[in-house]
């Protein structure tokens, strides 16, 4: 460890940096494949259900990173960068305010689905996305 990293904290920070990069890559892959607004909305629903699809490792790592970010500025910066990159991918299809709302929706619904004993159905996710992305008069 000491050959590549100055200590455990540097190793941990690098591991969380790589982890957050893998999640952003999923966002970029799903949203990059969308060619229309409807496909982009479906991609957002796919993200919610993919991220909450039973991979406890990702859920645990995400929450451990959030805990560190709440306590330590270096990890807060890492999560800020992660959110910024996720929103940029959403902005390929949605305006910045909508992208920010969708990013929070993805996060919240993913956490709720992962922790519920009976996760909500895709229809609820699709309806929430439609409400956020509906044209406003």
Where are these regions (language model features)?
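Short alpha-helical scaffolding segments that buttress acidic/His motifs in well-ordered protein cores
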Residues: 47-48, 62-66, 102, 106-109
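Append "Primarily bacterial transcriptional regulators
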Residues: 1
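Hydrophobic/aromatic-rich alpha-helical bundle segments in the mid-to-C-terminal region
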Residues: 75-80, 93-137
């Amino acid at each position: 460890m000491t050959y590549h990293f100055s200590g455990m904290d540097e190793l941990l920070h690098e591991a969380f940096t790589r982890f957050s990069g893998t999640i952003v890559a999923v966002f970029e892959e799903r949203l990059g494949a969308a060619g229309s607004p409807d496909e982009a909305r479906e991609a957002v629903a796919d993200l919610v259900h993919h991220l909450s699809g039973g991979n406890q490792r990702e859920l645990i790592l995400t929450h451990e990173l959030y805990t560190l970010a709440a306590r330590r500025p270096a990890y807060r910066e890492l999560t800020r960068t992660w959110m910024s990159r996720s929103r940029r991918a959403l902005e390929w299809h949605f305006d910045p305010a909508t992208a920010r709302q969708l990013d929070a929706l993805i996060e919240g619904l993913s956490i709720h689905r992962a922790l519920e004993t009976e996760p909500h159905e895709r229809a609820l996710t699709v309806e929430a996305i439609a409400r956020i992305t509906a044209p406003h008069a």
